[in-house]
Regions:
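Functionally constrained cores in energy, signaling, and assembly domains
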Residues: 5, 9, 29-34, 49, ...
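Short, structured active-site-proximal loop/turn typified by the sulfatase FGly-forming signature C/S-X-P-X-R
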Residues: 16-60, 108
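Generic recognition of stable, solvent-exposed alpha-helical segments in well-folded globular domains
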Residues: 8, 13, 20-23, 90, ...
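Short hydrophobic "helix-edge" motifs at membrane interfaces and signal-peptide entry regions
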Residues: 1-2, 134
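Short linear motifs at secondary-structure transitions and domain/linker junctions
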Residues: 11, 25-28, 39-40, 81, ...
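Glycine-/proline-rich flexible loop or hinge segments
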Residues: 6-10, 30-35, 45-48, 67-80
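Beta-strand elements within well-structured catalytic alpha/beta cores of enzymes
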Residues: 2-18, 27-28, 52, 95, ...
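His/Asp/Glu-rich, glycine-adjacent segments
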Residues: 56-199
């Protein structure tokens, strides 16, 4: 039987912060385990997450920043989402292959970058829509597609404007944590990766 594993990527959290002001995280760490990780340079979200998932340095996985310089457009494109931008075998691919003889190995990837089209069972990531009239519609991408709708029917629309930019705050992390709990309850993944950008 596969023992479920939840990996929380919490920006800026250090072991010294676990304590009376973080009772739920402290309890979770006590029931399982918590470990500090070093980082790579540049120490930005997309690069560090890609290193954690592949075990490779940026020179190996190819993610050297949060943005990509598109020569044809002479423009930096930030926050790209395609899983195909990352080179190398991912943790969830290696784990799935290692337990291939055991049926039922599953992965949930909640709000990690490069989440679109990832070979996982369940995933959700921010993905605004831009209609022809110039508006920005708060939205997200999910695999399977109806997962987003099911989560939003229970939790409301993902608060994208609280995820990044000048209005960023803990509201987005609360939504992601609640969505992750729902996915854990509904599907019981073998491996769950959740990114919480704010405390």
């Amino acid at each position: 039987m596969i023992r479920p594993l939840v990996v929380l990527n919490i920006v800026g959290l250090t072991p010294s912060m676990l304590g009376q002001h973080t009772p739920r995280l402290s309890e979770l760490a006590g029931r399982g385990f918590a470990c500090p990780l070093g980082t790579v340079l540049p120490a930005v979200t997309c690069t560090t997450q890609s290193t954690l998932l592949t075990g490779l340095l940026p020179s190996g996985h190819g993610v050297v920043a949060n943005g990509w310089y598109e020569r044809e457009l002479a423009e930096v494109m930030f926050w790209r989402q395609s899983n195909r931008l990352v080179s190398g075998e991912r943790l969830y691919e290696a784990a799935g292959a290692a337990v291939e003889s055991e049926s039922g190995y599953t992965t949930a990837k909640m709000f990690w970058w490069y989440n679109m089209h990832a070979p996982v069972d369940w995933s959700v990531t921010p993905r605004p829509s831009y209609p022809a009239d110039g508006r920005k519609v708060m939205d997200s991408y999910s695999q399977p597609a109806d997962l987003k709708d099911r989560l939003q029917s229970e939790l409301g629309v993902f608060p994208l404007m609280r995820f990044w930019g000048p209005g960023a705050n803990i509201a987005s992390s609360r939504w992601i944590a609640d969505a992750t709990i729902k996915v854990l309850e509904w599907h019981r993944p073998s491996l769950t990766l959740a990114y919480l950008p704010h405390l």
